[in-house]
Design a protein with these regions (language model features):
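Walker A (P-loop) phosphate-binding motif
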Residues: 171-217, 520
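Proline-aspartate-enriched helix->loop->beta-strand connector
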Residues: 257-259
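Switch II (G3) loop of P-loop NTPases
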Residues: 234-249, 406-412
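Membrane-proximal helical linkers
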Residues: 155-178, 195, 222
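Membrane-embedded segments
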Residues: 218-219, 223, 245-251
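ATP-dependent carboxylate-amine ligase
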Residues: 1-160, 370-380, 384-524
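Short beta-strand segments
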Residues: 185-187, 240, 301, 435-437, ...
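Acidic, Mg2+-coordinating active-site environments of NTP-dependent enzymes
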Residues: 263-405, 430, 451, 455-463, ...
Length: 524
């Protein structure tokens, strides 16, 4: 092999390796965001087929170069490498909202994938020799990056199950070794994370409390917290429980053994994976089913019709806004500086003040008050903790500036929460701007509910920026249905473009009040 051809082959190999690496990392990132579920990954591929094709079209050009030329001289290798380098430019990593986390599981899948790549390439060259056909077939490994993470995950599945089982058993051992610990489970289609944060502050007036951080609510996320943070000094463990499929709440309950639980809401969130609202109801009430019959208590938000109508034979404490439940709030007064309300329980009542804005927040606070009071914290001792409650980041978080106020509700939007966010926006005086890509994972109702969101926005907003050309369609249709002026509507390709548009909107001297409703992760 002459020197020039050797250099050309080396350049080709470098280009192929770089292209494979960039695309493998990209697809692994999406696989992680899709919870390592192959069916979710294939749905993502279908929704983003144009981007997927563009990531591999230059590789097809490299393959055709060898097929058409029928030889492996230096010029052919350089041309093929040029195609691959063009693909590398297109596949260059973009700034991610949530970066790929190189967990031990990801590293194991990566090692398995590398071994598979090496074996495939060796098999090709040992079978066909160093000809143009071998190089053309070798180029196909770049296209294989599309499914390689899923293949590696399938191969590693027995190992992953064994590792997970070890961690789960260890978490069970820790829980069983803390007989005086009270575990409170929290679940709901929405509101569970905010309620958890509020409850941690309210119970902290009397107890040493540990809660699962941020949105740690999967089985292995909970296991990680139990193994890494829970100890004998903790008196109460607040365990958030999330699910996308039937049985996932029960799986967490079997590990942490909750004594009490709270179901904050039931709605069409994750309807795409649950398939039906009945499956969502069944899954959320797996928490109630797991509680001890004798002294376990399930706290239920009776403002939610699905919860109120569901028959539950456990000891229950109900809460709501308005009345007719064990705990309820009324006399709710909302301003842009906060909210005042009165909470009742039997003959006892107490007025509370919070910096948080809107009845949506009051509902979650009342749920937290119901749990804390039932667990022995008097109303009088809850007044100051409620007053000191801070907004949970990205959940109706108010960020005030000189010329504009941001209402950051960017985390996991849902139909009820989105309406509550618009109601919060309506409280403020100023030029009201909505920035939103709409809501996802709502199954067959996704278009209908996003269109309704657009209709609701038309009643409140002075300007609407819909983010994402595909996601914007139902929102814009909802605005049009209400006769919303077209000149007050803008469709942005991404959040950065939307925020740039916010800066350029003329308000006639009014202060800008900007609602950021939902911020879809990178896999949408």
């Amino acid at each position: 092999m002459d020197i020039l051809r050797l250099i050309a082959v080396a350049v080709l190999g470098m280009a192929l390796g770089t292209s494979c690496g960039l695309n493998f990392i990209h697809y692994m990132h999406m696989f992680q965001l899709n919870s390592y579920h192959a069916d979710e990954q294939f749905k993502w591929i279908g929704k983003n087929i144009k981007d997927v094709i563009m990531r591999h079209v230059f590789t097809i050009g490299a393959i055709l170069t060898f097929i058409i030329c029928g030889e492996t001289n230096a010029s052919t290798c350089f041309i093929a490498a040029a195609f691959l380098f063009l693909g590398i430019v297109f596949s260059a990593p973009k700034k991610a909202k949530k970066k790929l986390v190189f967990t031990p599981r990801v590293m194991r899948m990566t090692v398995t994938s590398v071994i598979l790549y090496v074996l495939l390439i060796l098999l090709v060259f040992l079978t066909l020799g160093m000809g143009y056909a071998s190089l053309a077939i070798t180029m196909c490994v770049q296209i294989l990056t599309l499914v390689m993470a899923m293949i590696a995950n399938l191969i590693n599945k027995p190992i992953e199950l064994m590792i997970n089982r070890h961690y789960i058993n260890d978490a069970k051992r820790i829980i069983n070794g803390l007989p005086d610990l009270t575990v409170v489970g929290l679940t709901g289609s929405y509101g569970k994370t905010s309620t958890k944060f509020y409850l941690e502050k309210l119970l902290g007036a009397k107890y040493n409390v540990l809660m699962t951080p941020e949105s740690y609510n999967t089985t292995m996320g909970v296991v990680k917290v139990v193994r890494g943070q829970l100890n004998a000094t903790h008196e109460i463990f607040l365990c958030e429980m999330g699910a996308k499929n039937v049985g996932e709440i029960k799986e967490i309950c079997d590990i942490v053994k909750p004594k009490h639980g709270i179901i904050t809401s039931i709605g069409p969130q994750h309807l795409e994976t649950f398939k039906s609202i009945d499956n969502i109801i069944k899954t959320k009430f797996e928490l109630a089913d797991s509680l001890p019959d004798k002294d376990g208590i399930i706290f239920l938000n009776y403002d939610n019709e699905y919860i109120a109508k569901h028959e539950c034979n456990k000891n229950k404490v109900t809460y709501s806004l308005g009345g007719g439940t064990d705990y309820y709030a009324d006399n709710i007064s909302v301003s842009e500086n906060g909210t005042q309300f009165t909470v009742h329980n039997g003959n006892e009542e107490k007025q509370f003040t919070t910096k948080l804005i809107g009845s949506h927040n009051v509902q979650n606070i009342v749920g937290a008050i119901a749990v804390a009071n039932t667990l022995g914290v008097p109303f009088a001792d809850l007044v100051m903790p409620v007053k000191r409650l801070e907004c949970v980041p990205h959940r109706l978080q108010i960020i005030k500036g000189t010329n504009k106020t941001i209402i950051d509700d960017a985390f996991n939007s849902n139909p009820t929460g989105a309406k509550a966010a618009l109601d919060t926006l309506a409280v403020f005086d100023g030029f009201k701007i909505l920035v939103s890509p709409g809501m996802v994972e709502l199954g067959e109702k996704e278009y209908e509910l996003n269109k309704r969101f657009g209709e609701q926005a038309a009643e409140i907003c002075d300007f609407v920026i819909a983010v994402g050309e595909r996601q914007a369609v139902p929102i814009v249709d909802g605005l049009k249905a209400k006769g919303y002026p077209e000149e007050k509507t803008y469709v942005a390709k991404n959040l950065n473009e939307a925020l740039a548009k916010v800066e350029n909107i003329k308000t006639g001297g009014e202060k800008k009040i900007v609602l950021l409703e939902n911020d879809l992760p990178d896999n949408y």
